C-alpha cells in the first residue's frame, strides 16, 4: 500500500500505482482535470507513465463548466 496526500487528505492505495490508474480509481477518467504532483503540473500525456510513491502530494482540480 502507498499513502498519498490528495487535496490535503491522506488516502491509501495498492502499489504499484501510476497517475492514470489513480485517475481511474477516483472515477475521474474522461473529465477535464489538472494534476499537480509534488508542486509540478503533470501533462495529461504523461499520466500513464508517471509512477506514484508513498508521500507524494497531489492536487487535483476538476474543471466545471458554467456561464
Tell where the protein language model's regions lie, with residue ranges.
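Ubiquitin-like/PB1-type beta-grasp interaction modules and other compact soluble beta-rich domains
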Residues: 1-66
